[in-house]
């Protein structure tokens, strides 16, 4: 991380992963622990939403944020978008809780038993040691991340085509997608109007296209070191890599916010409520187009606005760490204001 020439910087507990930036083993332990927390939240909150779910009311009117995603995947849904069985949701929530325990055990193992520095290992584990100034090793780690993302996209396509299908809001049924769109021109054509997609075949085809693209990119980054032009354009440091990651998450968050707000195929009104209106007050926000009792909000409103504001703050983090990576010292701003006061 950026230390401005001070090699004796001490990070407190609240600094998070910055404490382990130069300890590859503990860095992995922290990531596994964070995955455990994420899985625990997903499992626990799924079970909480099941306890609050009222089948006599529309799902989108109940402020739920996890069950609508599971319903969109076709689990427990009958014709017309009616929820007929919540047991699959209980199973999925329980699996996430079990997975969180396994991941938590892995985090403890990497913290207590595995070396803090993977360079001291022998065998295959040593290849996952990294330093921020080593572009080739960072490329290998990036490649493995892309492989998992690609596998996730293809798993969704597999669920749509072979393992039960997805909920189709246009027919209000759960169906298999036997002929996904594989024409790259059609898929790439959505670049300018992606939020208007209304065909489940196109949606699944897009996941297949992106899945193979990610896997191809993952293999490339594992086998091929960063090219010369990339080394000249990009900064390779912990601060810079963090800024790139935050920028990517911010972009994904803004896209997801708008897509969730207006699209009714990936986010069926039966589960999320009707599309939202884009409003501008002190800041932009997405507003419900229906009035619910007690001034409640639809699931779509919660998700779209949460994604927007989280993306906004991720963007601020991207700019902060990008400037630090370039060498800008924010303490100089404070010093400048202090000099004005004196």
UniProtKB/Swiss-Prot annotation:
Keyword Transmembrane: yes
Transmembrane intervals: 25-45, 89-109, 138-158, 208-228, 240-260, 303-323
UniProt key word Cytoplasm: no
Keywords from the named record: Chlorophyll, Chromophore, Membrane, Photosynthesis, Photosystem I, Stress response, Thylakoid, Transmembrane, Transmembrane helix
Gene Ontology MF term list: chlorophyll binding
Protein name: Iron stress-induced chlorophyll-binding protein
A GO term from the CC aspect: plasma membrane-derived thylakoid membrane
Entry note: cofactor: Binds 16 chlorophyll a molecules per subunit.
Protein's membrane topology: Multi-pass membrane protein
Function: Functions as an antenna for photosystem I (PSI) under iron-limiting conditions, when phycobilisomes disappear. In the (PSI)3(Isi3)18 complex most of the harvested energy is probably used by PSI; in other PSI-containing supercomplexes a large part of the energy will probably not be used for light harvesting, but rather is dissipated to protect the organism from light damage.
Origin organism lineage: Bacteria, Bacillati, Cyanobacteriota, Cyanophyceae, Synechococcales
Localization terms from the record: Cellular thylakoid membrane
Species annotation: Synechocystis sp. (strain ATCC 27184 / PCC 6803 / Kazusa)
Induction: By iron stress, salt stress and to a lesser extent by heat shock.
GO BP, sorted A to Z: cellular response to iron ion starvation; photosynthetic electron transport chain
InterPro entries documented for this protein: PS_antenna-like, PS_II_antenna-like_sf
Quaternary data: Under iron-starvation forms a complex with PSI trimers, where the trimer is surrounded by a ring composed of 18 IsiA subunits. When the PSI subunits PsaF and PsaJ are missing the ring is composed of 17 IsiA subunits, indicating that each IsiA subunit has a different interaction with the trimer. This suggests that the size of the PSI complex determines the number of IsiA units in the surrounding ring. In the absence of PsaL has a tendency to form incomplete rings with PSI monomers, suggesting PsaL helps form the rings.
Protein family according to the UniProt entry: Belongs to the PsbB/PsbC family. IsiA/Pcb subfamily.
Required cofactor names: chlorophyll a; all-trans-beta-carotene; echinenone; all-trans-zeaxanthin
Main subcellular location: membrane
């Amino acid at each position: 991380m950026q230390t401005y020439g001070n090699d004796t910087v001490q990070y407190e507990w609240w600094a998070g992963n910055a404490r382990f930036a130069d300890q590859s083993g503990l860095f992995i332990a922290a990531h596994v622990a964070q995955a455990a927390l994420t899985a625990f939240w997903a499992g626990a909150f799924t079970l909480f939403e099941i306890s609050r779910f009222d089948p006599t009311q529309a799902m989108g009117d109940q402020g739920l944020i996890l069950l609508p995603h599971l319903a969109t995947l076709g689990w427990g849904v009958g014709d017309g978008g009616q929820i007929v069985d919540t047991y699959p949701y209980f199973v999925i929530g329980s699996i996430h809780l079990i997975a969180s325990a396994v991941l938590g055990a892995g985090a403890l193992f990497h913290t207590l038993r595995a070396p803090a520095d993977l360079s001291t290992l022998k065998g295959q584990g040593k290849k996952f040691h990294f330093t921020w100034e080593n572009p080739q090793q960072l490329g290998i780690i990036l490649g493995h991340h892309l492989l998992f993302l690609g596998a996730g996209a293809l798993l969704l396509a597999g669920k749509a085509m072979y393992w039960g299908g997805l909920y189709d809001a246009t027919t209000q049924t759960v169906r298999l997608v036997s002929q996904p769109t594989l024409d790259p021109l059609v898929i790439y054509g959505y670049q300018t109007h992606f939020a208007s997609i209304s065909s489940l075949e196109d949606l699944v085809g897009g996941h297949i296209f992106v899945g193979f693209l990610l896997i191809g990119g993952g293999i490339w980054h594992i086998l091929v070191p960063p090219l010369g032009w990339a080394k000249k354009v990009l900064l390779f440091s912990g601060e810079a890599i963090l800024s790139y990651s935050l920028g990517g998450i911010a972009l994904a968050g803004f896209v997801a916010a708008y897509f969730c707000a207006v699209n009714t195929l990936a986010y069926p009104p039966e589960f999320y409520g009707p599309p939202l209106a884009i409003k501008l007050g002190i800041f932009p926000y997405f507003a419900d187009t229906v009035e619910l009792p007690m001034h409640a909000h639809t699931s779509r409103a919660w998700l779209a606005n949460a994604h927007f504001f989280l993306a906004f703050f991720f963007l601020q983090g991207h700019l902060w760490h990008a400037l630090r990576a370039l060498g800008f010292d924010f303490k100089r701003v404070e010093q400048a204001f202090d000099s004005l006061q004196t």
